[in-house]
């Protein structure tokens, strides 16, 4: 793709503009080995530290900055944690079959956003706890309206050997903007911050029993959810899109 091509040219001084890249889709090793960048931004602390160790000579050209939401797009609301409603509003790499089973066993109202082609195969219309919100055409405003009726964001991904790329980032941004505690799979990039800053709960990816336990915990501990909601709102304010833009601006200014 273009960024690898330009990076390769830059390595041999055949690309004159300053070249900065935001790395979000791993693997990164080959790009750092064969290409040259004037600066690299990582969205995940795990990969940032790993690449600094693997390529110490380039570490001074690497930065860490969490991608955040545009807070002006979202309303400020009070969420209901006494009768929590879960939602998974992503489509890429989502293990919604697992979520259907876990929500049913935990007996917690759960909304799964899906188009006609990707409705979970184990979902049935008579399920008392899981509902499918069909959205064949993306509509951000309607999505925010739906999110405001829910209280907990779930990001259930399929198992993988390494941490996934930016899978779930949009859902996580929605959650940080609205103050929704998260239940995320252990192989997501945001799992680290969810644990570190108490933004929600992390379940072992692919583990039905663990996901069921985490959902049940949310139902039984509304006060803990309120605390997590305050934490994730604070995290969103401290890591919004304006901060990300300022990091990029400061790096660009340093080139001149």
Residues covered by each model-derived region:
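A short, well-ordered alpha-helix in the C-terminal region of glycosyltransferases
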Residues: 210, 217, 224-238, 250
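Acidic anion/phosphate-binding donor-loop and adjacent secondary structure
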Residues: 49-53, 63, 68-83, 97, ...
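Nucleotide-sugar-dependent
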Residues: 141, 155-173, 184-192
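A short alpha->beta transition loop at the rim of the catalytic pocket in nucleotide-sugar-dependent
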Residues: 151, 179-181
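Conserved catalytic-core segment of nucleotide-activated headgroup transferases in glycan assembly
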Residues: 81-143
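Conserved acidic donor-binding segment of nucleotide-sugar-dependent glycosyltransferases
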Residues: 196-197, 201-208, 217-223
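A short, active-site helix/loop in glycosyltransferases that binds the activated sugar's phosphate group
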Residues: 28-29, 38-61, 192
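C-terminal alpha-helical cap of glycosyltransferases
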Residues: 238-256
């Amino acid at each position: 793709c273009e960024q690898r091509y330009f990076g390769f040219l830059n390595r041999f001084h055949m690309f004159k503009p300053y070249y900065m890249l935001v790395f979000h889709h791993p693997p990164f090793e080959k790009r750092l080995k064969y290409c040259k960048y004037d600066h690299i931004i990582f969205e995940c602390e795990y990969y940032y530290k790993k690449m600094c160790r693997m390529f110490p000579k380039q570490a001074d050209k690497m930065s860490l900055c969490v991608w955040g939401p545009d807070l002006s797009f979202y309303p400020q609301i009070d969420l209901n944690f006494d009768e929590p409603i879960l939602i998974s509003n992503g489509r890429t790499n989502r293990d919604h079959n697992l979520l259907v089973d876990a929500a049913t066993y935990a007996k917690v109202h759960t909304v799964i956003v899906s188009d006609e082609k990707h409705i979970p195969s184990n979902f049935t219309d008579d399920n008392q706890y899981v509902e499918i919100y069909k959205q064949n055409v993306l509509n951000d405003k309607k999505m925010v309206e739906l999110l405001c009726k829910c209280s907990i964001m779930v990001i259930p991904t399929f198992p993988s050997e390494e941490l996934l790329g930016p899978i779930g980032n949009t859902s996580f941004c929605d959650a940080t903007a609205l103050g929704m505690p998260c239940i995320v799979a252990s192989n997501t990039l945001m799992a680290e911050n969810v644990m570190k800053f108490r933004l929600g709960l992390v379940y072992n990816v692919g583990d039905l029993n663990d996901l069921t336990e985490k959902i049940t915990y949310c139902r039984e501990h509304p006060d803990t959810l309120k605390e997590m909601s305050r934490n994730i709102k604070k995290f969103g304010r401290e890591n919004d899109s304006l901060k990300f833009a300022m990091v990029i601006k400061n790096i660009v200014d340093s080139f001149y």
